[in-house]
Amino acid sequence: LVGSEMCIRDRVGMECAYAPFNWTQDTDTTPDGSKAVKIAGSDYYAYGYDVAVAQKLADQMGMDLEVHKVEWSSIGISLDAGDYDCIIAGMGKTKEREASYAFTEPYYYRNNCIVVKKGGKYSNVKGLSDLADTGCKVTTQLGTGWIPLLDQIKGAEQSGNFETTSECFLAISNGSADVCVIDVPTAESAALTNDDLQIIELDENDTFTGDDEMVNVCIATRKDDTALRDKIQDAMNAIGWNDKAKMDELMDQVLTQQPAAN
């Protein structure tokens, strides 16, 4: 959406490595016949919840979807540089991010959880207090709103955070971390192909506080590009993408479509 391209291309940035929100695959086909989207400048394709939503919105706006793959650590920098025009990447709308970007209303609502090793020392945890003073090694993804939550696990050892969620889950599998704080869909996606993982949704009366921001997953544009933000929001409204039942149905669908490698 740059200059004369405004009505032609919907240029979207995403990690393409954050299943089930977005991932990279070899072909444009999925098991249910949905079409993955070619990654700009690549021989690979992207699919997942973010891609499916982006395609719906591009269709509504009469635009061609163009997916740009970018490292999570530089996803905002590349938006500001003009490499693409919006971020649809499982991004939570936080107060800190709102200072830098314009956001739509949520296109997904997610719950947070912890992931531990199945059958391990922490597999019977029910609430946050069960982890207190155990000296558990905690981790999450870099550059996310989950990092501040780690400090709420009393006496935990900060074992280091990772660029991708895949690395977080590998740390749980190999024992270099005991607890990963993450969202439920991402954990469910990983558990489909990693039998070492156990997902625990903490008791609502014994869980993290101040994590509400990470529940709202929104589309970001550059701070001054409110016209594009509003155009995307209008498209969301037009297709009724404020219905949590629709969101959950699509998420359930894409969870079954990811290649085993993701």
Please identify what each model-predicted range represents.
Residues 4, 9, 145-162, 199-201, ...:
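Ligand-binding clefts/hinges and TM-proximal coupling segments of bilobed small-molecule sensing domains
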Residues 5, 9-90, 99:
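Extracytoplasmic small-molecule ligand-binding "clamshell" domains
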Residues 11-13, 137-140, 180, 220:
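Short, well-ordered beta-strand segments
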Residues 16-19, 43-60, 91, 110-169, ...:
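Bilobed "Venus flytrap"/periplasmic-binding protein-like clamshell domains
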Residues 55, 59, 64-130, 204-212:
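Acidic, polar ligand-binding/catalytic clefts
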Residues 73-77, 90-100, 147-152, 173, ...:
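A ligand-binding cleft/hinge motif common to bilobed small-molecule-binding domains
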Residues 108-119, 193-236, 255-262:
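Periplasmic-binding protein-like
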